[in-house]
């Protein structure tokens, strides 16, 4: 079977609340680090989430 090109990543809140989302992305088409605005339920606001390694 072929190896998948998608890798699991963790999106961690830049507001230092400890909240994170997990998702996957295609490393071949998007090699740069992902940064996206998402809702942080801890502070109840939209903040930037930055990609980190999923342990």
UniProtKB/Swiss-Prot annotation:
GO cellular component: cytosolic large ribosomal subunit
InterPro entries referenced in this protein's UniProt entry, alphabetically: Ribosomal_bL33 (IPR001705), Ribosomal_bL33_CS (IPR018264), Ribosomal_bL33_sf (IPR038584), Ribosomal_zn-bd (IPR011332)
GO biological-process terms attached to the record: translation
UniProtKB keywords: Ribonucleoprotein, Ribosomal protein
UniProt region (Disordered), positions on chain: 1-32
Claim: Iron is one of the keywords in the record: no
Pfam family, one: Ribosomal_L33
Biased composition (Basic and acidic residues): 1-11
Domain of life: Bacteria
Single GO molecular function: structural constituent of ribosome
UniProt feature, compositional bias: Polar residues: 13-24
Gene3D superfamilies linked to this entry: Ribosomal protein L33 (2.20.28.120)
Keyword flag Ribonucleoprotein: yes
Family per record: Belongs to the bacterial ribosomal protein bL33 family.
Name of the protein this chain belongs to: Large ribosomal subunit protein bL33
Lineage: Bacteria, Pseudomonadati, Pseudomonadota, Betaproteobacteria, Burkholderiales
